[in-house]
Amino acid sequence: MYDASDPFYMVMQKYNMKRGNTMIKAGIIGATGYAGAELVRILMNHKEVEIAWYGSRSYVDENYADIYGNMFQIVDAKCMDDNMEELAESVDVIFTATPQGFLAGVLTEDILSKVKIVDLSADFRIKDVATYEKWYKIEHKSPQFIDEAVYGLCEINRDKVTKETRLVANPGCYTTCSILTAYPLVKEGLIDTDTLIVDAKSGTSGAGRGAKTPNLFCEVNESMKAYGVASHRHNPQIEEQLGYAAGKEILINFTPHLVPMNRGILATEYATLKKKPDGTLPTYDEIKAVYDKYYANEKFVRVLKKGVCPETKWVEGSNYVDVNFVIDERTGRIIMMGALDNLVKGAAGQAVQNMNLLFGFDEAEGLNMVPMFP
């Protein structure tokens, strides 16, 4: 909660009192996509937030509950357009759950001066414009805002997401899982990052709600395939963020796979362990101590017990990331594993986590969902 003596709090209170409430107002652009719908579900249980704008270019003036039947008699609102200028005048925070290029194409200093933005697209995740344009194959329309955008991986950049922050680049699903799984060992220099391989599996919701032949039931069911091999757009994000941790440029092999389930990501990562001065490999207890150093006090990262491998089912519908590792003494390599729900911690949940930091709320507010099982 806010500190009542905080000037920021007092300004917000005066602002909200003019509108007859003490809750902040949120607008969602892309509210009818899977990540946008998950934002709606989470924010409806957030005691500090009122959703004031269900933005959807495809469904303007249609009842939101007619699009998502699970919201029948829960959401009584019509979809609105994606007019960012009008929205910035009406709310305190905007979530843009939109395709790449949307926010960069409409963002102005005037908009940013009026409202905080949590962007779930990749427009401001990569600091190098040329790298963004190479991997996404579009021109970046607002490079002037890249430097100030904070990469909102909360467990790593929490101190940078503050009340003064205007723009948060919410990390992607594969990137969140891949980075958090390896981050402690990269940061502490315990693995040879030149040998790092990331093998990841995702459910079909990661491809979005749009109808595409490769994502039809008969195409996906009872099948599994690699895609974006050596070319997936999350590759440079993982390299950039782990490169910051390592203090040097990192190149990785990242291969995503599509599996026949609705939600979830499982990342299995491999790297050669660096030997200790005495020529031996780090022990299980030594590696476990490193993970505990970074994650023991983290609400949403769970380091599992020895011998327990993460499963997507154990995090489904929640904001948790489960991680663990196994040392292969025969090869001198370590196998790191991580699992999360791609729509929650991999998208909407992390976006709300960032919003909580932006407004000084309890970081876990609205996010204490118990994973669904079975």
Predicted regions and their residues:
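C-terminal substrate-binding/catalytic lobe of Rossmann-fold NAD(P)-dependent oxidoreductases
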Residues: 48-90, 194-200, 204-336
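N-terminal Rossmann-like NAD(P) cofactor-binding subdomain of oxidoreductases
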Residues: 2-222, 227-229, 326-329, 370-374
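Short, well-ordered loop/turn and helix-capping segments at boundaries between secondary-structure elements
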Residues: 45, 244, 357-361
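Conserved active-site and cofactor/substrate-binding residues in soluble primary-metabolism enzymes
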Residues: 34, 148, 176-180, 229-237, ...
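Short strand->helix junction
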Residues: 175, 276-277, 341
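Predominant activation on well-ordered alpha-helical scaffold segments within soluble catalytic domains
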Residues: 40, 179-186, 235-239, 288, ...
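NAD(P)-dependent Rossmann-like dehydrogenase/reductase catalytic/cofactor-binding core
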Residues: 320-374
